[in-house]
Amino acid sequence: HDVSDGGLLVTLAEIGFASRCGLAVDCSGLADDPLAAAFAEELGVVLQVAEADREAVEAAFDRAGIGNRLHRIGRPTEGGHLVIRHHGAVVFDEPLSALEQVWHETSHHLQALRDDPDCADEAHAAIADREDPGLRAELSFDPAEDVVAPLINTGVRPRVAVLREQGVNSHIEMAAAFERAGFEPLDLHTTDLMADPSRLQDCQALVACGGFSYGDVLGAGQGWARTILFNPTLREAFEGFFARPDTLALGVCNGCQMLSALREIIPGTSLWPDFHANRSRQYEARLSQVEVLPSRSLMLGDMAGSRLPVVVA
């Protein structure tokens, strides 16, 4: 971490915020004045090096002619405190959780004014929760197991319609993912089905891809859905597909929003939600911890009980 605004103390604090561990630091060799050592915004960088690699790092600095600029100042500790000593005296000792809340204070006030204040308060309070284990994966399945290999080896691949519309932009990687999972992808634009709705009859699966159909001008996924609902030919084709007992459908991102707006023609969707503005009043793009609950889903059923971080936008 480079030493910049706030000097060494802020640099060490930011390292502690990210690592969720304490730091024991001795700045005696940096300056006679501990304030100068802690807050000087001079050119520098803090490196964390494994003890086994320390001699090699020191040798590299010596070869570069800057070995005298290298100072061993501390180590990570348990307890969550940033402790700084100067010639044996403790000159600073504060919990990193409290320091992070101070560090985040300005952002918190700006967020409370700009966004939903309750959401801002919740995010600010969560900083102090050092018991939060953070994002992690607890899986009920082995991700290294190739569960589709036996099916692919049969030579019979179910056909999946990779559906796209004007503004959709993730159909290529979606087709690649389904191909790797044992499907035969079929690239279909909504206008393809307007010309020949029977093409959907040859598919056992349908995936509505992500992007920004019609630029979301009519609402997220709404214009795409209404293209289907208000076109009698398309509506009949999709109703027939969803009514078949041998089909499955997946909507991702904008495609999920589109499928939600089609629920009047999809059996068993009475509990599906509408998508409204976020409570935070902002676009949210996060890496979120989710849990897979038991369900009859063909895609998620064998993953029940798993907890893992997923991208949500």
Model-derived segments and their meaning:
Residues H1-F39, A50-R159, G167:
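Intein/HINT protein-splicing elements and their conserved insertion hotspots or analogous self-processing inserts
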